[in-house]
Amino acid sequence: MSTSSLCRLGALLACLLSTQAQAEQPALRFAVTESTAMPMMQIEHGEAVGGILYDLQSRLAQKVGREARMLVLPRLRVQSMMMHGEIDVRCNVSPAWLISGHHQYIWSLPFMFQHDVLVTRANMRHNKPKAGERIGTVLGFGYAALEARFLSGDLLREDVRTQDQVLEKLAARRYDFAVANQLTLDWFNRHLAADKRLVRIAEIGSDPLACIIRNEADVPTQALLRAMVQMKEDGELDAILARYR
């Protein structure tokens, strides 16, 4: 057998061994809240199929030699599963959003910032919510800048399940104002005529988004943390974000 044939055979065997080793390791369980919308995550029939988080989480798992199992779940279910160690990684989360601490988890570096904005329609005559105004919001989400007005009844929450539903109801004139994140707003507007687009009034909050990783022996925690740093330094994180802007 020639030297070149031996080299090709060696490469094939190495690939097969790597694939076998990956198959023997348990899949990493990534939590995805069902309220997430594009461009962060595309969810079809209860399954995660694309978006920023899909690409990020798939790449993270690949870099540590694991498969990614993405679990689309209600927000409260995610919190409960994390408390019981049933989630390995959760991305698209900020420390300020968690009700209770998770001592068995470690935070990664932030991979982006989420900017929450107050939104209305392009043809609205007034650009500030009046007393008693209904505001489109996502069920279970907190909005610190508006919380006092919600608690006093000066503004009224109109909760729906997902980010894109908030904007769809605003466009359909079910209410005149809503809160969304800037990325989801831009995605919603991308194919609309100028007079049909929803417009940003003001930014009401900004939070760093990171991944929180279970720190147990069956999870390659440090390898995942290093992978995030490497993806940041190599420009992979920026490249993923750029695909959806």
Residue locations for each model-derived region?
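Extracytoplasmic small-molecule ligand-binding "clamshell" domains
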Residues: 24-101, 130, 137, 159-160, ...
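Periplasmic-binding protein-like
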Residues: 34-36, 112-117, 190-229
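Short beta-strand-to-loop elements that line the ligand-binding cleft
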Residues: 67-74, 155-169, 201-202
